[in-house]
Amino acid sequence: MVSLSIIARKLFGSARESRIKRLRQKALQISALEEHFQKLSDGELCQKTDEFRQRLTDGETIDSLLPEAFATVREAAKRVYNMRPFDVQLIGGMVLHNRGIAEMRTGEGKTLMATLPVYLNALEGKGVHVVTVNDYLANRDAETMGKIYSFLGLTTGVILHDLDTNARRAAYACDITYATNNELGFDYLRDNMTFDRSQMVQRGHHYAIIDEVDSILIDEARTPLIISGPLEDRTDFYNLVNTFIPNLTPEDYEIDEKQKTTTFTEIGTEKIEKMLEQAGHLKNDSLYDIENVAIVHHVNNALKAHKLFVRDKDYIVRNGEIVIIDEFTGRMMPGRRYSEGLHQALEAKEHVAIQPENQTLASITFQNYFRMYEKLSGMTGTATTEAEEFSNIYGLEVVEIPTNLPVQRLDEDDEIYRTTEEKYRAIVRDIRQAHEKGQPILVGTTSIEKSEQLAERLRKEGITDFKVLNARYHEQEAYIVAQAGVPGALTIATNMAGRGTDIQLGGNIEMRIRQELQDIPEGSERTAKIEKIKQDVQKLKEKSLAAGGLYVLATERHESRRIDNQLRGRSGRQGDPGRSKFFLSLQDDLMRIFGSDRMDSILQKLGLKENEAIIHPWINKALEKAQKKVEARNFEIRKNLLKYDDVMNDQRKVIFEQRMEIMNAENLTDMMIEMRNDVIEDLIETHIPSGTYSEKWNAKALQSELSQCFNLELPIEEWVKEDGIAEQQILERILDAVTKFENERTEHYSPEMMVYFHKAILLKTIDMLWREHLINLDHLRSVIGFRGYAQRDPLNEYKTEAFELFQTMLKNLRRDVVSKLMSFEIVQHPLESTMPQEMYAEHSTSRNIDKKDGILWAQMQNNTEVSDPIKRDPGDSSTWEKVGRNELCPCGSSKKYKHCHGSFIPKMDG
């Protein structure tokens, strides 16, 4: 019986078809304007930008400008690059403008498509961020697409890793800014650690288009960006613990590859305890005693480093450093470090220099960073499989954009073998057959180790003319990938290495021009050579087409269908022919970890002989089912982690907003008085609570705490002996005494100086306590899961206790600020010595990776100038009024004023 949904779909079409139909109608409206825009001069076309901006000022909406704005960009692209965006690119541009994700096949022109909504939204003048996965793509796209924006009178900036603060600020001030997700996140964190608004570089989060959105918002969703500072050096202990692991046997530990965890068995725990005891590091006989918490952490990391992390698969050793390999792309991630001591454990394992651990100063995940944008959209070749996650987490709808030309790629059924050895024999055989007829081949592997194993097999078989593209040769990545479509080219690549670079049959013209003609200046010779390259590429393309187009051969299935689809999508761009096939074995990680027992028994019943493969659609469906299970599990993990991170994110917003208020404030006296009064009221409530008899009051403790906190001795014990005195009277006396004491201390300083002191005290105290709070939250997060054993919801427990920790932090903040305010001294201090603080930007995957990002200097500049009168008392600075910065200081020190009393910082006790 045919379901009603199928009947309805046949009658009315699917929701996607209806949406695309509506967008096509709008694309036709844009195309109808084309003839008019073709008649405009370059100046008139450029003038459209000012016209659109004026219309926005006059009350028109950005949506009403869309048809004309898109037509403007289309015409500009034709004039600048002789490239005309197709109607399907107009459709994709509208999806991006409407807060959606445009799923567009490889080679269909995502980069050009993005110029349409980028231009439209840049008209508002609030800044548009185009986000890419690496500096190369950010720089390339800013350079190429920037010419279109410049033609239309808009400015384009690019944020690269090595830019200084001023250059970053200038790039963010542009109408359009290209940057990587890492740089955007780190700049946000740095901005919220500055001491002055003028030191910030970003100007808000208005609209962002994320290229390769699945990579950033799905694959790296659990990746916190971390700003950290160094902790104490524990190199000797890492090396000691590292010597324990080789003495263990398989019965001493358990490995869960599915969950990626390692644990000691009871026998293993006893062995470790004995080794620690002999080394003099075990307290109270048990490894799991509360005093050995830090040791357990080190031992567990050492076990994980040795038994779970594989060299040349998860990381490589290069130039004496551990360099992490991205599990999704196979790329090196230089500068990134595993956090929480894991990276140090790997360094000890590989006997390279151990870098000190870092303390988190500020952090944010990509999930929470990109959800700050008022408007967010993305584009990729593969997003449909993750549509539910994009919708639930980010509120983004995935729209599959139709191709400009029909896809001609043939996706063949998988070939499955019993063993890895049989699989590789078949792969080499298939490569030889395709290679001999001149077909370009892209071989996809899942790790550096496997790509090099295959390369070695090919060499033994006499096939040597191939390129290996993996994390070891990252610098050549784009060029090698760009030429993978040349007839006879054989390229072995780890996963999605080279993503973002098109594989064009015959080779990439632009890449060849850049590579071959970089030293030849503009002129007739260069023009002639460019024409020759174009003719050569066309001939090579015809040969590649005749050989069947690009053949994508995958040596293994990934956990995610999306990654497999990305690899397939490298072939068959823009209607070109091509083919793809996956070669698998029952010993592959996916099959082995996620249950191939049933499949193995079926293959045995079928009487599968050695070197024989089974090819059947049922196998593909079974594999897809396994992948869906893994994807669903990973989605649940990400969703659950986000719930926990949202707790910290809410607190982070409060702290960062408070810092911004303080930096923007012209006078903080009222805030300081309020904090001071809150502290006093808390002390009163603690030691002489309302509604209690005076016999229950603890006057001695109150007097002691007032002395510590306010640097003020008050006769509280005598006051409480007075007949009929109430706690309210004591409160008023304390407030009066504290106010008088504070006024006497500050009357000699100008209002500007006091604002500076208040800001310095507040910001430094907030930052210090926030760092401690982050450590407390990390500790809480690491143990909260055990609450489940007591039949309590760990998430609710975490929310409750995190809130209590936050409340305690705010209480401590008030007390610390007041204490420092009441005890600071004004001392002479040269402006040049402004307390530098060493910090690192880090990038942590699954709360485990850090990214070293250079050294930042957090400096508090005192730009206030104290004035000086005609009659000046050297001992009384209040009589000096205005003093020139280069005049001698009135105090009689014979120093210039700017190097004496003209430069002050607060000296804080405690």
From Swiss-Prot:
EC number: 7.4.2.8
Reaction(s) catalysed by this chain's protein: ATP + H2O + cellular proteinSide 1 = ADP + phosphate + cellular proteinSide 2
Source superkingdom: Bacteria
Stored Pfam families: P-loop_SecA, SEC-C, SecA_DEAD, SecA_PP_bind, SecA_SW
InterPro entries: Helicase_ATP-bd, Helicase_C-like, P-loop_NTPase, SEC_C_motif, SecA, SecA_DEAD, SecA_motor_DEAD, SecA_preprotein_X-link_dom
GO cellular component, one term: plasma membrane
Binding of Zn(2+), residues: 889, 891, 900-901
Cofactor note: May bind 1 zinc ion per subunit.
Membrane-topology annotation of the record: Peripheral membrane protein
Subcellular location, principal: membrane
MF-aspect GO terms: ATP binding; metal ion binding; protein-exporting ATPase activity
Essential cofactor(s): Zn(2+)
GO terms under biological process: intracellular protein transmembrane transport; protein import; protein targeting; protein transport by the Sec complex
Keyword check for Transmembrane: no
PANTHER family the UniProt entry points to: CHLOROPLAST PROTEIN-TRANSPORTING ATPASE, SECA INNER MEMBRANE COMPONENT OF SEC PROTEIN SECRETION SYSTEM
General function of this protein: Part of the Sec protein translocase complex. Interacts with the SecYEG preprotein conducting channel. Has a central role in coupling the hydrolysis of ATP to the transfer of proteins into and across the cell membrane, serving both as a receptor for the preprotein-SecB complex and as an ATP-driven molecular motor driving the stepwise translocation of polypeptide chains across the membrane.
HAMAP family attached to this UniProt entry: SecA
Annotated family: Belongs to the SecA family.
Protein name (record): Protein translocase subunit SecA
Species this protein is from: Bartonella bacilliformis (strain ATCC 35685 / KC583 / Herrer 020/F12,63)
